[in-house]
Amino acid sequence: MRFPHICIMMNTLSDLSELSVLKGPNSISELRKYASILVIDDNEFAPESSLKRNGYQIQHKIDLDTMKDVEPYDIILCDISGVGKKLGFKNEGAFIIREIHASYPNKRIIAYTSYTYNPNYNQFFSMADFVAPKDLAI
């Protein structure tokens, strides 16, 4: 499923229900049913069960085996630290974001982290459609 434009209206992950989709599903329930979400995080993703209960199609991976692992998903929520190690990426999740941005320009990327990074990481964060702290309320 291709989403040419997604605009996040609020500041929480649950606000994915407030997405404005120019072409695609006609309702929020259709978006939940058809938009697939991949979470790449080496830690437990606490909101996963809540999002699933609310009808979201969500999959959690601790790391990627190959970059092709992201192909089936429309929205990728990627941690910055602790992921990308299997692929040997020096900048871990930041490099995953760069690769998704370059290889899959129609995917929506959310950088998700609990750390503050030095300005060298700004180039990676700018490739994400949205940057969210891990303590974001859901």
Give residue spans per PLM region:
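A short, well-structured beta->alpha microelement
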Residues: 51-73
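A short, hydrophobic beta-strand element within the central beta-sheet of small alpha/beta folds
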Residues: 95-124, 128
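A structural signal for hydrophobic residues in beta-strands of small regulatory alpha/beta folds
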Residues: 130-133
